[in-house]
Amino acid sequence: MAIKKYKPTSAGRRNMSVSDFAEITTDKPEKSLLAPLHKKGGRNNQGRLTVRHQGGGHKRQYRVIDFKRNKDGIPGRVATIEYDPNRSANIALINYADGEKRYILAPKGLTVGTVIVSGPDADIKTGNALPLANIPVGTVIHNIELRPGKGGQLVRSAGTEAQLLGKEGDYALVRLNSGETRYILSTCRATIGQVGNVEHELINIGKAGRSRWKGIRPTVRGSVMNPNDHPHGGGEGKAPIGRPSPMSPWGKPTLGYKTRKKNKHSDKYIVRRRKK
């Protein structure tokens, strides 16, 4: 998929770029796999703001994605490659031999007409899903489970990939996209290949309004707020922070401050921490 750049016909068009959507084969999703998606505006069930910079944006419908890939032994044919407004990756509609339809994350190189299958006996081919125990060392994988049967949780964004480095007893050693190397139960499943839409990270939003279409609200610096709104606020003109280190809006140290728990349960599975 290529990136289309605009001519600078206006300030908003200058440097703006979009995907050319060459891989997309239809603009009409499968209705049976749609679910309503209500906007929360970053609020929780008490109505309090828990995630800043969210709100507005174009209406969306949720596409129900099969992250578990548990339909073993039944071949499925790729019917369409579709855009999904809820994630950076594209999705593929799979028509299974028994008549069921499911969406999966579209790996790089997956095309309409390709036949995929899940299960321990599946071939090592892009789009097939297998337990880590059945995948050869060195294979590039994505959509990795952390608990058997829970569904893929790791490596799902556009262009991401992980690599299977080795197997030790009941665990497989996997290097994630962040650079972190960790053990994962070898009974957990993963899908072969790299997530598609690789050039997503090269897209330049170009103007503020396009962020608003996506439901992203402005990010205001703390130094331009009042002192009752932010620890950095107040003062005349461009005043310094006035504290030993930068603070979050709630007065906690930030920008380099370690927030991971000292004795977290998953520490014993992590061989090498992610890159800074």
Curated annotation (Swiss-Prot):
Region annotated Disordered, chain positions: 35-55, 222-276
Quote the biased-composition stretches of kind Basic residues, using this chain's numbering: 258-276
> Keyword Disulfide bond, does the record have it?
no
Q: Which terms in the Gene Ontology molecular function aspect does this entry carry?
A: rRNA binding; structural constituent of ribosome; transferase activity
Output the InterPro entries linked to this UniProt entry.
NA-bd_OB-fold, Rib_uL2_dom2, Ribosomal_uL2, Ribosomal_uL2_bac/org-type, Ribosomal_uL2_C, Ribosomal_uL2_CS, Ribosomal_uL2_dom3, Ribosomal_uL2_RNA-bd_dom
Give one GO biological process term: cytoplasmic translation
Q: How does it assemble?
A: Part of the 50S ribosomal subunit. Forms a bridge to the 30S subunit in the 70S ribosome.
Record function comment: One of the primary rRNA binding proteins. Required for association of the 30S and 50S subunits to form the 70S ribosome, for tRNA binding and peptide bond formation. It has been suggested to have peptidyltransferase activity; this is somewhat controversial. Makes several contacts with the 16S rRNA in the 70S ribosome.
Which NCBIfam families does the record associate with it? rplB_bact
**Which HAMAP family has this protein been placed in?**
Ribosomal_uL2_B (MF_01320_B)
Query: Which family does the entry's similarity section mention?
Result: Belongs to the universal ribosomal protein uL2 family.
Q: What is this protein called?
A: Large ribosomal subunit protein uL2
User: What is the gene called?
Assistant: rplB
